[in-house]
Swiss-Prot record:
UniProt keyword Transmembrane, yes or no: yes
Gene field: cysT
UniProt keyword terms in alphabetical order: Chloroplast, Membrane, Plastid, Sulfate transport, Transmembrane, Transmembrane helix, Transport
Listed InterPro entries: CysT_permease (IPR011865), MetI-like (IPR000515), MetI-like_sf (IPR035906), Sulph_transpt2 (IPR005667)
The ABC transmembrane type-1 domain, residue ranges: 73-276
Name this protein carries in UniProt: Probable sulfate transport system permease protein cysT
Subcellular location: Plastid, Chloroplast membrane
Biological source species: Anthoceros angustus
Family annotation (CDD domains): TM_PBP2 (cd06261)
A GO-annotated cellular component: chloroplast membrane
Length: 288
Protein backbone atom coordinates (compact mmCIF):
# COMPACT_ATOMS: atom_id res chain seq x y z
CA UNK A 1 0.00 0.00 0.00
CA UNK A 2 2.85 2.40 0.77
CA UNK A 3 4.18 1.93 -2.76
CA UNK A 4 0.77 2.75 -4.22
CA UNK A 5 0.63 6.03 -2.33
CA UNK A 6 3.72 7.28 -4.17
CA UNK A 7 2.62 6.16 -7.67
CA UNK A 8 0.84 9.45 -8.46
CA UNK A 9 3.88 11.40 -7.26
CA UNK A 10 6.18 9.36 -9.49
CA UNK A 11 3.87 9.95 -12.45
CA UNK A 12 3.93 13.70 -11.87
CA UNK A 13 7.73 13.61 -11.66
CA UNK A 14 7.89 11.83 -15.01
CA UNK A 15 5.52 14.33 -16.60
CA UNK A 16 7.66 17.26 -15.50
CA UNK A 17 10.89 15.38 -16.32
CA UNK A 18 12.20 15.80 -12.80
CA UNK A 19 12.59 19.57 -13.06
CA UNK A 20 11.61 20.57 -9.53
CA UNK A 21 13.54 23.78 -9.06
CA UNK A 22 11.79 25.98 -6.50
CA UNK A 23 9.66 28.52 -8.40
CA UNK A 24 12.47 29.71 -10.66
CA UNK A 25 10.66 29.06 -13.95
CA UNK A 26 7.31 28.11 -15.38
CA UNK A 27 8.02 24.37 -15.29
CA UNK A 28 8.73 24.51 -11.55
CA UNK A 29 5.45 26.30 -10.89
CA UNK A 30 3.64 23.76 -13.05
CA UNK A 31 5.30 20.87 -11.22
CA UNK A 32 4.46 22.29 -7.80
CA UNK A 33 0.83 22.84 -8.81
CA UNK A 34 0.60 19.34 -10.22
CA UNK A 35 2.00 17.79 -7.05
CA UNK A 36 -0.39 19.80 -4.90
CA UNK A 37 -3.39 18.74 -6.99
CA UNK A 38 -2.37 15.10 -6.84
CA UNK A 39 -1.86 15.12 -3.07
CA UNK A 40 -5.08 16.98 -2.28
CA UNK A 41 -7.47 15.59 -4.90
CA UNK A 42 -6.18 12.59 -6.81
CA UNK A 43 -4.50 10.65 -4.00
CA UNK A 44 -7.56 10.27 -1.69
CA UNK A 45 -9.73 9.26 -4.66
CA UNK A 46 -7.11 6.80 -5.86
CA UNK A 47 -6.84 5.16 -2.44
CA UNK A 48 -10.62 4.88 -2.12
CA UNK A 49 -10.86 3.19 -5.53
CA UNK A 50 -7.98 0.90 -4.61
CA UNK A 51 -9.71 -0.10 -1.37
CA UNK A 52 -12.93 -0.81 -3.24
CA UNK A 53 -11.10 -2.89 -5.85
CA UNK A 54 -9.64 -5.09 -3.09
CA UNK A 55 -13.13 -6.09 -1.92
CA UNK A 56 -14.26 -9.58 -3.03
CA UNK A 57 -16.88 -9.61 -5.78
CA UNK A 58 -19.32 -11.36 -3.45
CA UNK A 59 -19.16 -8.46 -0.98
CA UNK A 60 -19.50 -5.91 -3.77
CA UNK A 61 -22.59 -7.66 -5.12
CA UNK A 62 -24.09 -8.13 -1.67
CA UNK A 63 -23.60 -4.52 -0.63
CA UNK A 64 -24.80 -2.95 -3.86
CA UNK A 65 -28.00 -5.01 -3.94
CA UNK A 66 -29.11 -4.53 -0.34
CA UNK A 67 -32.67 -3.11 -0.27
CA UNK A 68 -31.69 -0.39 2.19
CA UNK A 69 -28.82 0.75 -0.03
CA UNK A 70 -30.94 0.68 -3.19
CA UNK A 71 -33.59 2.72 -1.40
CA UNK A 72 -30.96 5.19 -0.21
CA UNK A 73 -29.65 5.58 -3.76
CA UNK A 74 -33.17 6.17 -5.07
CA UNK A 75 -33.89 8.74 -2.36
CA UNK A 76 -30.56 10.51 -2.85
CA UNK A 77 -30.67 10.85 -6.62
CA UNK A 78 -34.40 11.57 -6.89
CA UNK A 79 -34.33 14.33 -4.28
CA UNK A 80 -31.12 15.78 -5.71
CA UNK A 81 -32.70 15.82 -9.18
CA UNK A 82 -35.81 17.52 -7.81
CA UNK A 83 -33.73 20.10 -5.96
CA UNK A 84 -31.52 20.97 -8.90
CA UNK A 85 -34.49 21.18 -11.27
CA UNK A 86 -36.10 23.77 -9.01
CA UNK A 87 -32.79 25.59 -8.56
CA UNK A 88 -32.12 25.65 -12.30
CA UNK A 89 -35.32 27.65 -12.79
CA UNK A 90 -35.16 29.95 -9.78
CA UNK A 91 -31.37 30.25 -9.89
CA UNK A 92 -31.62 31.56 -13.44
CA UNK A 93 -34.31 34.04 -12.37
CA UNK A 94 -32.27 35.25 -9.38
CA UNK A 95 -29.13 35.67 -11.50
CA UNK A 96 -31.16 37.56 -14.12
CA UNK A 97 -32.60 39.92 -11.49
CA UNK A 98 -29.19 40.57 -9.91
CA UNK A 99 -27.63 41.44 -13.28
CA UNK A 100 -30.43 43.19 -15.14
CA UNK A 101 -32.14 45.25 -12.43
CA UNK A 102 -31.19 47.87 -9.88
CA UNK A 103 -33.24 47.96 -6.68
CA UNK A 104 -32.97 48.65 -2.98
CA UNK A 105 -31.40 45.74 -1.14
CA UNK A 106 -29.66 44.29 -4.20
CA UNK A 107 -26.33 44.02 -2.38
CA UNK A 108 -28.03 42.27 0.52
CA UNK A 109 -29.69 39.73 -1.78
CA UNK A 110 -26.38 39.18 -3.57
CA UNK A 111 -24.70 38.43 -0.23
CA UNK A 112 -27.52 36.15 0.94
CA UNK A 113 -27.02 33.96 -2.13
CA UNK A 114 -23.54 33.06 -0.83
CA UNK A 115 -24.70 32.20 2.70
CA UNK A 116 -24.86 28.41 2.08
CA UNK A 117 -21.18 28.61 1.07
CA UNK A 118 -20.21 30.30 4.33
CA UNK A 119 -22.49 28.58 6.84
CA UNK A 120 -21.54 25.26 8.43
CA UNK A 121 -23.90 22.53 7.28
CA UNK A 122 -25.21 22.02 10.81
CA UNK A 123 -26.12 25.72 11.04
CA UNK A 124 -27.97 25.45 7.76
CA UNK A 125 -29.91 22.44 9.03
CA UNK A 126 -30.75 24.19 12.28
CA UNK A 127 -31.93 27.24 10.34
CA UNK A 128 -34.24 25.13 8.20
CA UNK A 129 -35.59 23.41 11.32
CA UNK A 130 -36.30 26.80 12.91
CA UNK A 131 -38.21 27.97 9.85
CA UNK A 132 -40.11 24.82 8.87
CA UNK A 133 -40.73 23.06 12.19
CA UNK A 134 -44.28 22.86 13.56
CA UNK A 135 -43.58 25.91 15.74
CA UNK A 136 -41.48 27.73 13.16
CA UNK A 137 -42.40 30.62 10.91
CA UNK A 138 -43.44 28.50 7.93
CA UNK A 139 -44.36 25.32 9.78
CA UNK A 140 -48.02 26.17 10.53
CA UNK A 141 -48.54 27.33 6.93
CA UNK A 142 -47.06 24.11 5.54
CA UNK A 143 -49.13 22.05 7.99
CA UNK A 144 -52.26 23.85 6.81
CA UNK A 145 -51.41 22.77 3.26
CA UNK A 146 -50.86 19.19 4.39
CA UNK A 147 -47.07 19.40 4.09
CA UNK A 148 -44.62 18.30 6.76
CA UNK A 149 -41.05 19.42 6.07
CA UNK A 150 -39.07 18.63 9.22
CA UNK A 151 -38.46 14.94 10.00
CA UNK A 152 -39.99 13.81 6.71
CA UNK A 153 -38.88 12.96 3.19
CA UNK A 154 -39.63 16.54 2.09
CA UNK A 155 -36.87 17.73 4.38
CA UNK A 156 -34.25 16.14 2.12
CA UNK A 157 -34.98 18.19 -1.03
CA UNK A 158 -35.49 21.28 1.11
CA UNK A 159 -31.97 20.90 2.53
CA UNK A 160 -30.41 20.15 -0.87
CA UNK A 161 -32.18 23.14 -2.45
CA UNK A 162 -30.66 25.34 0.25
CA UNK A 163 -27.07 24.16 -0.24
CA UNK A 164 -27.04 23.87 -4.05
CA UNK A 165 -28.73 27.12 -5.13
CA UNK A 166 -25.53 29.27 -5.03
CA UNK A 167 -23.80 26.98 -7.54
CA UNK A 168 -26.43 27.75 -10.17
CA UNK A 169 -26.60 31.48 -9.49
CA UNK A 170 -22.84 32.04 -9.35
CA UNK A 171 -22.09 30.14 -12.56
CA UNK A 172 -24.78 31.95 -14.55
CA UNK A 173 -24.20 35.45 -13.17
CA UNK A 174 -20.77 36.25 -14.72
CA UNK A 175 -21.81 34.88 -18.11
CA UNK A 176 -24.99 36.93 -18.02
CA UNK A 177 -22.94 40.04 -17.23
CA UNK A 178 -20.87 39.43 -20.38
CA UNK A 179 -23.88 39.10 -22.69
CA UNK A 180 -23.87 42.13 -24.97
CA UNK A 181 -26.99 44.22 -24.49
CA UNK A 182 -26.76 45.30 -28.14
CA UNK A 183 -27.88 41.82 -29.19
CA UNK A 184 -31.05 42.07 -27.14
CA UNK A 185 -31.70 45.65 -28.27
CA UNK A 186 -31.30 44.62 -31.91
CA UNK A 187 -33.87 41.87 -31.44
CA UNK A 188 -36.30 44.31 -29.86
CA UNK A 189 -35.80 46.75 -32.75
CA UNK A 190 -36.91 44.15 -35.30
CA UNK A 191 -40.06 43.44 -33.31
CA UNK A 192 -39.08 40.46 -31.15
CA UNK A 193 -40.86 40.17 -27.83
CA UNK A 194 -38.85 40.00 -24.59
CA UNK A 195 -39.71 36.30 -24.25
CA UNK A 196 -38.60 35.56 -27.84
CA UNK A 197 -35.41 37.51 -27.27
CA UNK A 198 -34.69 35.54 -24.11
CA UNK A 199 -35.37 32.14 -25.69
CA UNK A 200 -33.48 32.74 -28.94
CA UNK A 201 -30.59 34.96 -27.84
CA UNK A 202 -29.96 34.96 -24.10
CA UNK A 203 -30.80 31.37 -23.20
CA UNK A 204 -28.50 29.72 -25.82
CA UNK A 205 -25.62 31.84 -24.52
CA UNK A 206 -26.40 30.87 -20.93
CA UNK A 207 -26.93 27.15 -21.56
CA UNK A 208 -23.29 26.03 -20.98
CA UNK A 209 -23.07 27.89 -17.67
CA UNK A 210 -26.53 26.67 -16.68
CA UNK A 211 -25.47 23.07 -17.32
CA UNK A 212 -22.28 23.60 -15.32
CA UNK A 213 -24.17 25.12 -12.41
CA UNK A 214 -26.75 22.35 -12.35
CA UNK A 215 -24.04 19.68 -12.51
CA UNK A 216 -22.11 21.24 -9.64
CA UNK A 217 -25.30 21.74 -7.66
CA UNK A 218 -26.38 18.16 -8.30
CA UNK A 219 -23.05 16.82 -7.07
CA UNK A 220 -23.28 19.05 -4.01
CA UNK A 221 -26.82 17.85 -3.31
CA UNK A 222 -25.76 14.21 -3.52
CA UNK A 223 -23.02 14.74 -0.95
CA UNK A 224 -24.97 16.87 1.54
CA UNK A 225 -24.89 15.47 5.07
CA UNK A 226 -24.92 18.06 7.86
CA UNK A 227 -28.26 19.72 7.17
CA UNK A 228 -30.03 16.52 6.10
CA UNK A 229 -29.10 14.64 9.25
CA UNK A 230 -30.85 17.36 11.27
CA UNK A 231 -33.96 18.06 9.21
CA UNK A 232 -34.81 14.50 8.08
CA UNK A 233 -35.63 11.51 10.28
CA UNK A 234 -33.04 9.32 8.43
CA UNK A 235 -35.15 6.16 8.57
CA UNK A 236 -34.13 3.37 6.15
CA UNK A 237 -36.54 2.78 3.27
CA UNK A 238 -38.11 6.19 3.96
CA UNK A 239 -35.81 9.21 3.76
CA UNK A 240 -32.32 7.82 4.39
CA UNK A 241 -29.77 9.20 1.93
CA UNK A 242 -26.37 7.89 0.90
CA UNK A 243 -24.25 10.37 2.86
CA UNK A 244 -26.03 9.53 6.12
CA UNK A 245 -25.96 5.82 5.29
CA UNK A 246 -22.18 5.90 4.88
CA UNK A 247 -21.80 7.51 8.30
CA UNK A 248 -24.15 4.93 9.83
CA UNK A 249 -22.07 2.12 8.35
CA UNK A 250 -18.92 3.62 9.82
CA UNK A 251 -20.63 3.83 13.21
CA UNK A 252 -21.45 0.13 12.87
CA UNK A 253 -17.80 -0.61 11.92
CA UNK A 254 -18.93 -1.78 8.48
CA UNK A 255 -15.95 -0.27 6.70
CA UNK A 256 -16.28 -2.52 3.65
CA UNK A 257 -19.87 -1.47 3.08
CA UNK A 258 -19.03 2.21 3.55
CA UNK A 259 -16.17 2.01 1.03
CA UNK A 260 -18.31 0.29 -1.59
CA UNK A 261 -21.19 2.74 -1.22
CA UNK A 262 -18.84 5.75 -1.28
CA UNK A 263 -17.11 4.44 -4.40
CA UNK A 264 -20.39 4.11 -6.28
CA UNK A 265 -21.32 7.69 -5.38
CA UNK A 266 -17.86 8.87 -6.44
CA UNK A 267 -18.14 7.16 -9.83
CA UNK A 268 -21.67 8.47 -10.39
CA UNK A 269 -20.70 12.05 -9.52
CA UNK A 270 -17.58 11.97 -11.68
CA UNK A 271 -19.51 10.43 -14.57
CA UNK A 272 -22.16 13.13 -14.37
CA UNK A 273 -19.59 15.92 -14.40
CA UNK A 274 -17.77 14.28 -17.31
CA UNK A 275 -20.97 14.07 -19.35
CA UNK A 276 -21.79 17.72 -18.67
CA UNK A 277 -18.29 18.78 -19.76
CA UNK A 278 -18.65 16.78 -22.98
CA UNK A 279 -22.01 18.41 -23.69
CA UNK A 280 -20.49 21.84 -23.10
CA UNK A 281 -17.64 21.16 -25.52
CA UNK A 282 -20.11 19.88 -28.09
CA UNK A 283 -22.24 23.02 -27.80
CA UNK A 284 -19.19 25.26 -28.02
CA UNK A 285 -18.05 23.48 -31.18
CA UNK A 286 -21.51 23.91 -32.71
CA UNK A 287 -21.51 27.63 -31.96
CA UNK A 288 -18.20 28.20 -33.78
Amino acid sequence: MSQLIFIPLLISLLVTKGKIRFLNNFESVLALSLHYGILVLALPIFILLYKAKKQPCSILLKVTTEPIILSAYATTFSTAFLAITINALFGLIIAWILVKYEFTGKETLDAIVDLPFALPASVGGLTLMTVYSDRGWMGPICSGLGLKIVFSRLGVPMATIFVSLPFVVRTIQPVLQDVEEELEEAAWCIGASPWTTFCQISLPLLTPSLLTGTALGFSRAIGEYGSIVLIACNIPMKDLVISVLIFQKLEQYDYQGAIVVATIVLIASFGGLLIINKVQLWKQNLSK
